[in-house]
Regions:
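Tubulin/FtsZ superfamily GTPase core signature
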Residues: 2-168
């Protein structure tokens, strides 16, 4: 399949089988479907929203064109530990068995409350950049949500990994 697409995100069904979660087949498919739906909605929102710094379809194409395996993660944080919570959510995904380690292309799209400190944004972007390849190209999007307080939502799309033979 990867030979016929620009980018591929895989949800290994084996990761839905754990001792802690006793899922029926229907429940496991619903979880995989929900992850896929959430990711598609996140990409659609990135493309269609008009934020302070926009990410458009051309930007998504730039990141994903000919990229091979890809990683997508969505993080949410509120309050004092919001940045660290988000970093933990977007750097890697246990379910997808992927991370941004070695990514040479990233989209980082942030929606934040209007009271967010610039130091929070700096901490977030530095941690994401540090986790990727040293020469990573980052397309950054940013908007505000006036209905939230002390909160951030972040979508990260990572692609074009240094070692394409490994799962990112």
């Amino acid at each position: 399949l990867i030979k016929h697409v620009d980018a591929l995100i895989v949800i290994p069904n084996q990761n839905l089988i754990t001792n802690e979660m006793r899922l029926t087949m229907k429940q496991s498919y619903a979880i995989a479907d929900e992850v896929l739906k959430t990711d598609v909605i996140a990409i659609a929102e990135i493309i269609t929203r008009h934020d302070e710094i926009n990410v458009d379809f051309a930007d998504v194409t730039t990141i994903l064109k000919g990229a091979g395996r890809a990683h997508i993660a969505i993080g949410h944080g509120e309050g004092k530990d919001k940045v660290q919570d988000i970093i933990n959510q977007v750097i890697s995904s246990d379910l997808l068995e992927t991370s941004i380690k070695g990514a040479r292309r990233l989209i980082v799209n942030v929606t934040m409350s209007e009271d967010l400190l610039i130091s929070d944004m700096d901490e977030l972007t530095a941690a994401i950049a540090d986790a990727a390849d040293d020469n990573v190209e980052i397309i950054f999007g940013n908007g505000t949500n006036p209905d939230t307080k002390d909160a951030m939502d972040v979508t990260v799309i990572a692609a074009d990994f240094v070692d394409r033979d490994d799962v990112p």
